[in-house]
């Protein structure tokens, strides 16, 4: 038989400032239709040598804040209705976590709430600023 492992990638922050909730809901809708077995989430990190950095400098795109990115993850987890492994384990995530949905949904949401409540934008931004080029 053939083993098909479909992986979805949620690039948290890619929609830009103020667009995280909309982006998360749209991503959840797509994932809910495709039924991947694993959804991996990485946080967008903009480097000075990137085209996106040039767009920020030109004022044509605004980067989402660090706390906003965690709010986006919370919205995504809240709107996933399929059984799936959800993982945010990459170096671009200041906090790594994973769980099986729907069973671990409340634990994941609680962890995200704690990060949103406890962490400052400056501390999370410092992590991102000091992240070596991926």
Regions found by a protein language model. Give the residues of each.
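Catalytic cores of alpha/beta
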Residues: 7-33
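Auxiliary Fe-S-binding modules of radical SAM enzymes
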Residues: 25-134
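Short, catalytically relevant binding-site loops at active-site mouths
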Residues: 5-17, 38, 45-49
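Structural beta-sheet core signal
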Residues: 1-3, 88
């Amino acid at each position: 038989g053939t083993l098909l492992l479909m992986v979805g990638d949620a690039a948290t922050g890619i929609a830009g400032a103020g667009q995280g909730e909309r982006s998360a809901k749209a991503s959840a809708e797509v994932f809910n239709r495709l039924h991947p077995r694993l959804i991996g989430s990485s946080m967008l990190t903009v480097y000075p040598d990137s085209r996106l950095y040039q767009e920020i400098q030109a004022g044509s795109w605004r980067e989402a804040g660090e706390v906003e990115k965690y709010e986006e993850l919370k919205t995504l987890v809240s709107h996933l209705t399929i059984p799936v492994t959800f993982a945010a384990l990459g170096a671009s995530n200041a906090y790594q976590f994973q769980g099986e949905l729907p069973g671990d949904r409340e634990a994941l949401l609680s962890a995200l709430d704690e990060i949103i409540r406890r962490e400052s934008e400056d501390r999370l931004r410092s992590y991102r600023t000091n992240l070596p080029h991926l």
